[in-house]
A protein has these predicted regions:
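Acidic, Ser/Thr-rich intrinsically disordered and amphipathic helical segments
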Residues: 1, 16, 27, 32, ...
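Basic, flexible linker segments flanking DNA-binding modules
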Residues: 36-68, 100-101
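C-terminal anion-handling pockets and recognition modules
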Residues: 75-79, 85, 208-270
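Extended, low-complexity cationic-aromatic segments
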Residues: 58-157, 263-264
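Acidic/histidine-rich, metal-coordinating catalytic segments
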Residues: 82-84, 165-179, 205-206
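A short, amphipathic alpha-helix used for macromolecular contacts
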Residues: 1-35, 63-77
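RNase H-like polynucleotidyl transferase catalytic core
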Residues: 46-49, 111-112, 171-175, 191-210
Length: 270
C-alpha cells in the first residue's frame, strides 16, 4: 500500500501514510514508513518548479522537438538565443555561511544586510550564440513593446555583428506578448531578421537558461552591495563566460529535443 500510494501520488507525506494505514487497521510510525521508502530507493526531495503546461503547450513542444530532431548542429549554430531574467540582490547570498564565535551572530561581519522584499532586483535582457555571449542590457522600469524594440535595436543587431553572424542567422525569443506584438513582428521583418518559431512555456528548450544559472552563481560569489553594483558585476561576469561553454550548449542541443520527446512533451531536466 505504501509504495502504491507514493507511486501514484509522490506528494503524499509520511503523516498521510500513517493516517491511511491507521484507517485500514495497521499502526505504523513515520520512521518506519521513511525506512521502508528508503529501502525502495526513494528519498524525500524538494519538488522542482516547472512551467504550468496545458495540453496545447505539450503538443506544441512535441511538434517542435520532432520537427527539429534531425536538424544538423550547423542549424543551431546559426541561432542567436535570447531571454530576460531577474537577478535578486540578496537572493543566493542570503544563505551564505560564516565562521563566527557564539553570540556573535549579529556582528556586521557575520550578517548579510537585507531590506524588506529581499533588497530589490534587476531585470536583464541578454543573448548568446555558439560563438559566445552577446550584449547584456539592464531593463529599467516596466518593459512594453516599444521598449523591447528599442532594446533589440540597441543590443540585438550589435550582438549579431560582434558574434559574426553571417547571412541566414536566426533569432530566438519566446512568445511573450511584447515579442509577438504586431509592431515587433513588423520591426523584425523590416530588419530582415528571421525568427525561430517557438513553443510557449519552454524555458528548458532555451540553452540561455544554463547561462543565467551560471551568471547568478558567479554574481553571488562577488556579493554585490547595491543594485548599481549588481548591474556592473552582472555585465563583468557575463563577459567572462567562455565561448567554449556557449559552443557546448549549442552542440548538445539535440539532447534537449530527445528529452522532450522521451518525456512526452512535459518539462525536462534542462
Amino acid at each position: 500500500m505504501i509504495m502504491r500510494t507514493v507511486r501514484n501520488q509522490p506528494r503524499t507525506t509520511r503523516e498521510d501514510l500513517v493516517n491511511d494505514l491507521k484507517a485500514a487497521g495497521t499502526i505504523v510510525t513515520k520512521k518506519t514508513i521513511g525506512n521502508t521508502l528508503r529501502r525502495e530507493g526513494l528519498k524525500s526531495c524538494s519538488a522542482r518548479k516547472v512551467p504550468l503546461l496545458k495540453k496545447t503547450h505539450i503538443q506544441a513542444r512535441l511538434k517542435f522537438a520532432n520537427e527539429h530532431l534531425n536538424d544538423s548542429e550547423e542549424n543551431w549554430v546559426k541561432v542567436l538565443w535570447s531571454d530576460e531574467t531577474k537577478i535578486e540582490l540578496f537572493g543566493i547570498n542570503s544563505t551564505r555561511r560564516v565562521w563566527r564565535r557564539r553570540n556573535a551572530a549579529y556582528d556586521p561581519k557575520n550578517s548579510i544586510p537585507t531590506i524588506k522584499h529581499g533588497g530589490g532586483n534587476i531585470m536583464l535582457w541578454g543573448c548568446f550564440s555558439a560563438k559566445g555571449t552577446g550584449q547584456l542590457h539592464r531593463i529599467k522600469g516596466t518593459m512594453d513593446g516599444a521598449m523591447y524594440r528599442q532594446i533589440l535595436g540597441e543590443n540585438l543587431l550589435p550582438s549579431a555583428r560582434a558574434l559574426k553572424k553571417g547571412r541566414g542567422w536566426v533569432f530566438q525569443h519566446d512568445n511573450d506578448p511584447k515579442h509577438t506584438a504586431k509592431a515587433t513582428k513588423e520591426w523584425l521583418k523590416k530588419k530582415h531578421i528571421k525568427v525561430l518559431e517557438w513553443p510557449s512555456q519552454s524555458p528548458d528548450l532555451n540553452p540561455i537558461e544554463n547561462l543565467w544559472r551560471e551568471l547568478k552563481v558567479r554574481v553571488a560569489k562577488r556579493q554585490p552591495r547595491n543594485l548599481n553594483d549588481l548591474e556592473k558585476i552582472c555585465k563583468e561576469e557575463w563577459d567572462k563566460i567562455l565561448p567554449e561553454m556557449c559552443a557546448n550548449l549549442v552542440a548538445n542541443y539535440k539532447k534537449r529535443l530527445t528529452s522532450v520527446i522521451a518525456n512526452k512533451g512535459f518539462a525536462t531536466k534542462y
